[in-house]
Each structure stands twice: as C-alpha cells, then as structure tokens.
Regions:
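Thiamine diphosphate
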Residues: 1-164, 169-170, 180, ...
C-alpha cells in the first residue's frame, strides 16, 4: 500500500477531482470565500462556471449559503482555510450545515501547523471542534491519493463532512492502484510488535518518516493510519492497541481533542490498554516559520519522533 520513499508529488489534486465531480454530477457546487487560487480551484470556474460560487471574503456567508443551496438540491463543497472554516464560521457550520441530513462538505486548507503565519492562520483545534458536532464526518487525509478519493466519497455522505485540504504539490505516499479509501476504515501501514504508532493526516507522513528511521535502527514497531476521526472504527483501533505496552499518536493538531483524544477515549471506554503518549502540538501556541522549523521546535521532526519511540521500545 505504501509507495517507496521520494515519490514525485501531485500538483493541485483538488483541482482535478473537482472538475471531475462537476462533469459527472451537475448538482455539485464548488464554493470559496475569495481564495480561489489559494485552494487550487482553476478548472471549474472556466469550464463549469454555473457550478462555481465565490461569496467573497465572508466565511460565515460561505457556509450559510452552502447550507441554503443544499436545501435546493445542490451538493456544496465549501472551501477556505481551516482556521476560518472552524474558528470564524463554526456557528454556521454547526447550525446551518450540521443539523440536517443533506450533504454539506467543508474543506479546510492549510490545516494545523502547515501555515507559516502562526496562530492567525494555523488551525490546531479544528479536528477537536468538528469531532464534537453530532453526526458529523471528520476526515484528515495524508496524501494526494487519499485526498482525491476522500473528496469523491464526501459527496455521497449524508450530513456535514469536514475535511482537511491539501494544496499545491501534494505528497504521494499511498499507491493509487492498491489503496481504496473508505469512510471510517483504518489502514495498517506496517505490521509488527513493539510500540504501536497511530497517526492521521500530515502526522501519518511524519510517522512514515520516523518509521523508516526505526527500521534502519532495527526497532520493531507497527503503524496504523486513521484518516477518519469520525465515525471511527473503535474496535479496529482497540485491536491495534491491545497487547502492546506503549502506543504513540502523531498528529498535525493540538494533543487535546484530536486523534490522541480519540485513542484515549477508546482506551478509557474499555477500561485499560497500553500507556499512551500523544505527540502533536502541546497545549500552547505553535511558533511561526517554515514547516521544518515548526516541526523541529515541537519535536515532530522525523529524528525526534523516532528517538522518543525508540526509547520506549
């Protein structure tokens, strides 16, 4: 399922999948809030202008209008930065989109610490917020293969779907000929004994980097990818944890309420489990700067992650 290291990236996969969806389904409406080139929307406005709507720099309007057109039979895919989709327009996401059965897709780009602009544009709490919305679907894709398939799946999912978006040249980790995304499903990327690593989104990319370092060091371990944080298959995650002495979660998110919170809840519900270490953004504001700098300052670079896991082996 995992491709060899150093695969060429995929340029603007969101642009390709949205034009594909619009051509196959005239009810799909691609929406944005004055961020068209920054969320990789290029082909739809030119080729399917009646299926594109830019509401201007007004994220609350973006989601409330999206909810409104869903009642007229459209399938909105509303795009903006994750910080705006979650923090600025959360009330509209919950009340307008989240309380009905109609499909409403919200895609938040530059999630977590992937923005260099510090807290103004970083979104390290969006997964925790959206996980708490009743009946919502929450997806954090790892690469171009998964992101493309998840967008396709989202337009057939009833109710609110919140997904983190990937833009620009997006990494390719998963083999598109072998990988099949399914909402809720988990994916074992490395089987083994010893410490277990559970990751999601960009955290899975970082976990794969650390896993390769651990392999070179002869450290046995296992790696589970959890792209859907809600609805998650708790039993699959529990089976992965069961029988291990240590489990680590790795995520591009605050350690409160995201993947680490999900795994902790599963263990608590079952009354035990291995010792859990949550690796992500600690309970303080992340710095600004390049992604490499931010990761290293938070102990999320491959070497730091591998060292922490190796010490527990």
């Amino acid at each position: 399922m995992l491709l060899p290291a150093d695969q060429p990236g995929v340029v603007a996969p969101f642009d390709d999948v949205t034009i594909e969806l619009c051509k196959s389904n005239p009810d799909v409406m691609i929406m944005t809030a004055d961020l068209q080139p920054y969320v990789d929307i290029f082909q739809v406005p030119k080729e399917r202008p009646k299926q594109f709507l830019d509401v201007g720099m007004a994220e609350q309007n973006l989601l409330s209008i999206g909810a409104g057109i869903s009642k007229a039979g459209f399938i909105p895919i509303a795009t903006t930065f994750a910080c705006y989709a979650s923090r600025r327009a959360f009330d509209q996401m919950v009340i307008c989109m989240g309380t009905g059965p109609r499909t409403c897709v919200v895609i938040g780009f530059t999630p977590g610490i992937t923005s260099p602009a510090r807290i103004h544009h970083q979104s390290t709490e969006d997964l925790a917020m959206t996980r708490a919305v009743p009946h919502a679907t929450v997806i954090d894709p790892v690469d171009a293969t998964e992101f493309t398939q998840a967008v396709r799946a989202s337009v057939t999912q009833p109710g609110l779907v919140y997904m983190r978006g990937l833009r620009g040249t997006v990494a390719r980790l998963l083999d598109p000929d072998r990988y099949v995304f399914e909402i809720g499903k988990t994916y074992c990327l490395r089987d083994g004994g010893g410490p277990g690593i559970i990751a999601t989104g960009a955290g899975t990319e970082w976990a794969v980097e650390a896993s390769r370092l651990l392999e070179r060091a002869g450290i046995d371990h296992a790696l589970l990818h959890v792209p859907t944080l809600k609805p998650a298959r708790h039993e699959e995650i529990w089976r992965f944890c069961e029988g291990r002495s240590r489990v680590f979660t790795i995520e591009n998110h605050n350690i409160v309420g995201g993947l680490g919170g999900l795994v902790a809840e599963i263990m608590a519900d079952r009354g035990g489990g291995p010792r859990l270490t949550r690796l992500g953004v600690p309970d303080h504001w992340a710095p600004g700067g390049s992604l490499g700098y931010i990761r290293k300052s938070l102990g999320l670079d491959a070497e730091s992650l591998a060292r922490q896991i190796k010490e527990a082996a």
